[in-house]
């Protein structure tokens, strides 16, 4: 005999109507909360039970969902040497920056692990090692941060500092950054609180001078002040749907104590500040090492101090929250050529894979690769120019490729890169084909 479902309402001893859970029959006095639906109610206990049942079923079907629910501190701690080797598979050069990042990240997650068992009030408190990366556009700052997050299997998000403003002004507030990290972790709060946030263009929020201004600077010093709270570690109420469009929503509290922040920027002109300071004791220092394409002095940037950053426009409190400072070198012709072909996800390898899916072998002549590098250097945007140069050339070829009959090989020449001339096509027997 089928059991009758419990109704959503019942009668008390004195005849008054009361709310009952439609699943377990408990009254509002027996539970913490009751959620109402069309002609039905469900209590918080039944919601929790239902969630556990669904979680187990989903985990059995989808292993990645189970992994997402597991605590991230169980992830194997990777040594600095192993981190640096892994970074080297994707990032060409920048050995000093890779070593600094490897040590800082290793210490950061070692610090988190130690917090799980260190309860003695006399224990030494290890502070968080947020990182500041200084280097020209297109030198790999974002790629380094992204690769680290992938290697460690932690949530990752990128924020543009230029879009941030103080709360109450048009633009994104700093809580938006944490909301994006929450999305990246599929709303897994524990994974969110151990993720990595990369804040790009951090130099753009420097105030115009080191002197205190009486005018309101909502996208400069004001943003630095707002970022202090989440950089140093605090519990922040984050609106999951975005703060300003949905002010009525319930906040999710995120503790930023164990979130690693990596800030990056070009800091154009910083080398001149350093040179001016250094030249007082060493005349002509660094004058022979300027990069001819970027104007950057890579050697002198390594001597950057907190005072230099303060003079540039970062407030002392903000600088203090970024104890690890590393610089990246401008990319020369050799480095750009290596970036094209050597990393695991090199752009040339990606194009070859795409052509392979169409049954066509793709080849670039050495002269073609040199021409790509020359054009990229002229544009002055580092490695990111490589893709844009190639994309502008390859788009027409990839548009026609699926409909070309009998083509088994495509050779990109220097003339193809420079003048958009037709590449060399070959049939399966090695004969050159002319495509009308």
Curated annotation (Swiss-Prot):
Name used for this protein in its record: ATP-dependent Clp protease ATP-binding subunit ClpX
InterPro entries: AAA+_ATPase, ATP-dep_Clp_protease_ClpX, ATPase_AAA_core, Clp_ATPase_C, Clp_protease_ATP-bd_su_ClpX, ClpX_bact, P-loop_NTPase, Znf_CppX_C4
Gene Ontology MF terms: ATP binding; ATP hydrolysis activity; ATP-dependent protein folding chaperone; protein dimerization activity; unfolded protein binding; zinc ion binding
Source species taxonomy: Bacteria, Pseudomonadati, Chlorobiota, Chlorobiia, Chlorobiales
Family membership: Belongs to the ClpX chaperone family.
GO terms under cellular component: HslUV protease complex
Primary role: ATP-dependent specificity component of the Clp protease. It directs the protease to specific substrates. Can perform chaperone functions in the absence of ClpP.
Keywords noted in UniProt: ATP-binding, Chaperone, Metal-binding, Nucleotide-binding, Zinc
Gene: clpX
Domain called ClpX-type ZB: residue spans: 9-62
Residues bound to ATP: 136-143
Bilayer-crossing regions: none
Domain of life: Bacteria
Record-linked SUPFAM superfamilies: Glucocorticoid receptor-like (DNA-binding domain), P-loop containing nucleoside triphosphate hydrolases
SMART domains: AAA (SM00382), ClpB_D2-small (SM01086), zf-C4_ClpX (SM00994)
One Gene Ontology term from the biological process aspect of the record: cell division
NCBIfam families the record matches: clpX (TIGR00382), PRK05342.1 (NF003745)
Subunit structure, as described in the record: Component of the ClpX-ClpP complex. Forms a hexameric ring that, in the presence of ATP, binds to fourteen ClpP subunits assembled into a disk-like structure with a central cavity, resembling the structure of eukaryotic proteasomes.
Protein residues bound to Zn(2+): 21, 24, 43, 46
Pfam families, A to Z: AAA_2 (PF07724), ClpB_D2-small (PF10431), zf-C4_ClpX (PF06689)
